[in-house]
Amino acid sequence: MTETPTAQPDRAADADTPQHRYTAELAGQIEGAWQQTWAVEGTFNVPNPVGELAPPDGTVPADKMFVQDMFPYPSGEGLHVGHPLGYIATDVYARYYRMTGRNVLHALGFDAFGLPAEQYAVQTGTHPRTRTEANIVNFRRQLGRLGLGHDTRRSFSTTDVDFYTWTQWIFLQIYNAWFDRDANRARPIAELIGEFESGVRTLDDGRPWSELSAGERADVVDSYRLVYRADSMVNWCPGLGTVLANEEVTADGRSDRGNFPVFRKRLRQWMMRITAYSDRLLEDLEVLDWPDKVKTMQRNWIGRSTGASVQFGTDAGDIEVFTTRPDTLFGATYLVLAPEHPLVEQLAAEQWPDDVDGRWTFGATTPREAVAAYRASIAAKSDLERQENKTKTGAFLGAYATNPANGQQVPIFIADYVLIGYGTGAIMAVPGHDQRDWEFAHEFGLPVVEVISGGDISEAAYAGDGLLVNSDYLDGLDVAAAKAAITDRLVADGRGRARVEYKLRDWLFARQRYWGEPFPIVYDSDGRPHPLPESALPVELPDVPDYSPVLFDPDDADSEPNPPLNKATDWVHVELDLGDGLQTYTRDTNVMPQWAGSSWYELRYTDPLNKEALCAKENEAYWMGPQPAEHGPDDPGGVDLYVGGVEHAVLHLLYSRFWHKVLYDLGHVSSREPYRRLVNQGYIQAFAYTDSRGSYVPAAEVVERDGKFWFEGAEVFQEFGKIGKSLKNSVSPDEICDNYGADTLRVYEMSMGPLEASRPWATKDVVGAHRFLQRVWRLVVDEQSGAVRVANHEALDTDTLRALHRTVAGVSEDYAALRNNTAAAKLIEYTNHLTKEGVTARAAIEPLVLMVAPLAPHLAEELWRRLGHDTSLAHGPFPVADPQYLVTDTVEYPVQVNGKVRSRITVDADAGKDTLEAAALADEKVQAFLNGATPKKVIVVPGRLVNLVV
């Protein structure tokens, strides 16, 4: 980046370089050799209690640990230096605990299905599978260079048939289950059918089960399933040819992938009933060792609120409204429905009432025309856009509803700030006490009634507490009492009930694409879905020559999805015997969303070779089962440490928790949560540069001169942000490994700052980590001769003993707490001490090599071997601190004169007040400030300070 050459180690030794110096070339040779040794010896392979990975005698260590990374999507660009941050951190953690004797499971797979691979394939004409497999090979090569201690037998890709067989199997378990609200858990659908057949459970309409036709029974059962089809409002993206989950749509109503317009459209789609688990998903956040930020994000996403359901009567039937403020019902002066509400068509009148306010008509000649025009005007808006603070818009339906509190007729509008996905898709508008309603009322000339005293509703809505007014029998009550009283009255009148509502919506679980897991579902000639038997799995994704999605004009909101699998006609139409003879069925041509594989992959790491089950119960219980003795009586179980980016706080983590809880309810796993502990790593950021047009230029070719930055002779402008291909500031880990070695990259990334914090990348600073490793090397190896320079029987002086054991204690604590940056700092300090004092004693240097091993494993293994050991240090032992050397002999005290620190003194740790006072008065700096004066008072605070008052 600068015109001044950056210091880099020579890849090959020149004439002036000692023959046995730790150079980039030597580092590369050492790293390659040890990676091969680890692979051949299976150094990081860990045993399972049962199955193919079990030892012959079936015994496994009781002290296990399961460490997991959020697995990568194998993109075509490969890794940049920001990607390995979390992988290296977990490797350091796993290596440390492995050296302390723990049986550590650490493996890494690939999340390879989904839109990115398909989009790239469409652009290049390469089949998604071909490109994905090539990308995985490159990722494995790049990750392999880093020396990550993974059990490679447990690696997989979500696109492997052996993996997605079990994704389909889990789908069938969820499909063939229902949520028993009385038991607050999922149960097999067969048990529900048994209850209907026995009469234990009856139909809501009172019909006997025996009188229902087969089709009617199927409809009832399907309405209970945890997976169901529904006509629902979805996010349709014509430019991608698929529907998207809410989480895949940006705030400005465009697709996160490709930046295409997204439209709200009603389609029949597969849904997963995640809302049934809302309370449990909330409650179990309390027992998880997760960042508070992530817990808050999940709580907000689930969005639990308590209130009342209120029925407003209309000519088209009752409109159900959910409100958290039933106490304000007397102040409801109009209703607003989401434009997509199913009653809109029935309510919209043929003509406007006499003397209708022109502001209410949306410029249309009839209410029905107003509805059509208004819907068209908001079709491309995202939910967030619809709720932004702006001028309120809407249209009157030409219809009225009856307020159940006072019997008054109130007009009914549609408006975009009411969403069909929350509550009932209808609100009672109380403009006196809700600011959005107040703004809408002022825009449309609607009445504003005060029902809570304490504010000036002529200026703005009053949302505070107060006593009820203008509310009949509620007058004089406080808000809490009024809520209870009005809810009781609504229940008594049959016009409402107490209710809990959630923002969380059921999970849209289908995509109209090619590159995803096929559904194990077929349809009969009547269009009724049937789950395939488990024996029919896997349903393999067919190889088709035309896998591109059916795309539309990005602005064509009226287009309809046409999944690419429809083109595979030989695959789509299949003859099966599902219990009633051989019949022709049609396969479901949607595929699962990209979140499917990542919603359960932690379980497959525990038993990746099992062909008979998702994972053996013994293996899941060993690696993920609850451990009340270690983690407390309410331990939910799960992976011991999960590390990944905070961007997955809601989607992936919420979906995986949902799937795991269903599997727990059905008895397939012993843990009720997938991840016991979560840590979000920060990001590695870097400078990027733009020219006068705002276009990014290659950061590696920018030079700095006189405080300005130049590219090809023209001035460019520096900015700071993420590393990436689009910003042209990407740095490949291959480049750093080539120029310094993988161990240097590991040490540099770990020493840049706390794991959770983002940090700036600076290639010019990498050399500092390399020089540290060179100093460690020189403590063991003579650079001139290559001989080991360690003395076997040299005794350690007291200072070195203290430095050693304090380093061991501090580094152990730091590794366990993922404070790798401070661990590195302590190791550098100890290395400097040994170098400065010329220590060559084996007793001082071998512990250093062991402590360095989690950070720089290749170097440590090589030094360990040169020190005469014939086994790997990967399994320890990690040094243990001797407590006698951790005692502090001296203490430093600040000395204040009239409250300001003027000096510092060092005294024995057990020094008394008299000694402290004498030492403070004898200090030269203090004497200078006293200038011969005698202090009026000396205040000694043991362990903290000395203050002289003059």
Curated annotation (Swiss-Prot):
Catalytic activity: tRNA(Leu) + L-leucine + ATP = L-leucyl-tRNA(Leu) + AMP + diphosphate
Recorded superkingdom: Bacteria
Binding, ATP: 725
CDD domains in the cross-refs: Anticodon_Ia_Leu_BEm
GO CC annotations, alphabetized: cytosol
GO molecular function: aminoacyl-tRNA deacylase activity; ATP binding; leucine-tRNA ligase activity
Motif ('KMSKS' region): 722-726
EC number: 6.1.1.4
Short sequence motif 'HIGH' region: positions: 72-83
Keywords associated with the record: Aminoacyl-tRNA synthetase, ATP-binding, Cytoplasm, Ligase, Nucleotide-binding, Protein biosynthesis
SUPFAM superfamilies, per the entry: Anticodon-binding domain of a subclass of class I aminoacyl-tRNA synthetases, Nucleotidylyl transferase, ValRS/IleRS/LeuRS editing domain
Coiled coil: none
UniProt KW DNA-binding keyword: no
Family: Belongs to the class-I aminoacyl-tRNA synthetase family.
Protein's UniProt name: Leucine--tRNA ligase
Organism expressing this protein natively: Mycobacterium sp. (strain KMS)
Name of the gene this protein is made from: leuS
